[in-house]
Amino acid sequence: MRTIFLLTLLTLAALCLSDLTDAKPSGPESDKAFMSKQEGNKVVNRLRRYLGASVPSPDPLEPTREQCELNPACDELSDQYGLKTAYKRIYGITI
């Protein structure tokens, strides 16, 4: 068992150290896989859209909040218990 293991290990070492695995293909096809530094920089440094200051999205509860502010009872309850609970107690509708 030990000899099989050593033989396998030596075979793998021979394959790793051989010059056949390190040989690079020579020809016009081998250069197509790589690009110059300038071409690479053009790809990496292209303009980045959508990275500017984003516009905050409108609050979906804003109309409800404005309607609740017009009613003094709802406004007082919203200060104590929160907008959703106050709106539900006054108007009976779940937001």
UniProtKB/Swiss-Prot annotation:
One of its GO terms (cellular component) is cytoplasm. Ca(2+) 3 binds at E69, D75. Disruption phenotype: Mice lacking Bglap and Bglap2 show increased bone formation, characterized by higher bone mass and bones of improved functional quality. Mice lacking Bglap and Bglap2 also display reduced male fertility due to decreased testosterone production in the testes. Mice lacking Bglap and Bglap2 are passive and show greater anxiety-like behaviors due to impaired synthesis of neurotransmitters. Residues 46-92 form the Gla domain. GO terms for molecular function: calcium ion binding; hormone activity; structural constituent of bone. GO terms for biological process: biomineral tissue development; bone development; brain development; cellular response to BMP stimulus; cellular response to insulin stimulus; cognition; glucose homeostasis; learning or memory. It is found in: Secreted. Keywords: Biomineralization, Calcium, Cleavage on pair of basic residues, Disulfide bond, Gamma-carboxyglutamic acid, Hormone, Metal-binding, Secreted, Signal. The modification 4-carboxyglutamate is found at E62, E66, E69. Bone. Residues 24-49 form a propeptide. Gamma-carboxyglutamate residues are formed by vitamin K dependent carboxylation by GGCX. These residues are essential for the binding of calcium. Carboxylated in a Ptprv/Esp-dependent process. Decarboxylation promotes the hormone activity. Disulfide bonds join C68-C74. Transmembrane segments: none annotated. This is Osteocalcin. The lineage of its organism: Eukaryota, Metazoa, Chordata, Craniata, Vertebrata. The gene is Bglap.
